[in-house]
Amino acid sequence: KNPESYNKILEHLYGKNGLKFTHFKVEMGADVNTSSGTEPATMRYEDEKADVTRGAGFQLAADIKKINPDVTLDMLWWSEPKWVSDSSDVYAARYKWYKQTLDAAYETYGLVLDYVSANQNERAVDTDWIKYLSKALKSEKDCPYDYSEIKIVAADECGTWGISRLMMKNKELCDAVDVIGSHYTSFADDTTKKLAEEYGKELWFSEGSSPMNYAQSAYRFDEGNSG
């Protein structure tokens, strides 16, 4: 309804004369409240074609890419459609949801995803699923661009880097994960630092709060450790 204001906001956040944000996360959605709203599911039924126009996220990603084509895109999820969780083969069903959503994002908006978050937001880490997703993307042939180039983020845990310890004990898992992300933490433990320094893993503070929003979990990463 207000395209000029909308574009002005996007220019301020992502434009060359603005804040120059470089990354955008888009939720796949499952028609449930995910703490800040309800994002529509891209696939409500197993036999329907994925529809990325139901919510605003993918359209927003496309508009951001018009302003700055170098912005990287990450796809993640807080919950999944019931047909996925009720499936006799949850991993295959979940991958179908991922894959068809990736396909639809490209077909509808020309979006190429740089990252996908494997784990459900702030839930128990499913290492077998992370490995399954990595193998499936790397071997996918029926795709509009090279899905093997999509990097996997794990595990969006809250206040811990537990995934790092699991990775150090499991080479296949370690190889599957490109980015280690944690929420609401002001530190990285020695194992996580080793994975970054010796194994080349990216480390992300992948969710946090600004001081004026929720000061208890907001951190200023300065030399004084002012927190």
Name each region found by the language model.
Residues 29, 121, 185:
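Flexible loop residues that form catalytic
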Residues 1-113, 118, 127, 131:
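N-terminal catalytic cores of secreted or lumenal carbohydrate-active enzymes
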Residues 78, 121, 157:
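Short, well-ordered beta-to-alpha junction loops that form the rim of enzyme active sites
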Residues 73, 99, 103, 108, ...:
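Substrate-binding and catalytic surfaces of secreted/luminal carbohydrate-active proteins
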